[in-house]
Amino acid sequence: MLLRDGAPDFAAGRAYYAMFYAAEAALANTELQFRKHSGVHAAFGEHLAKPGLLDAKFHRWLLDAFDKRILGDYSYEMDVNDAAAREMIGQAREFVSAVDTYLKSH
């Protein structure tokens, strides 16, 4: 809806948050606590991507999506175009699906 309404920067931000909250859910049983997004990013890489529990591409996507969210939310110029937002939305769907599958099996 945001993308259709001409707000690719905000659409990209919401795609990031879908990945971020899925990452938090995947890390819920680690008993780790996080104060910053960077803590979730690092723990996702260390505890899920590095040991191969989830594909390492998801860690990269999470980091890239965070950077684009920062640009989209805090930049004065529109830095995230429609194509980039569509790609992030597709990645977010795949990311959330992979985490859902992981959670069902762990």
Where are these regions (language model features)?
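Terminal alpha-helical segments
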Residues: 1-106
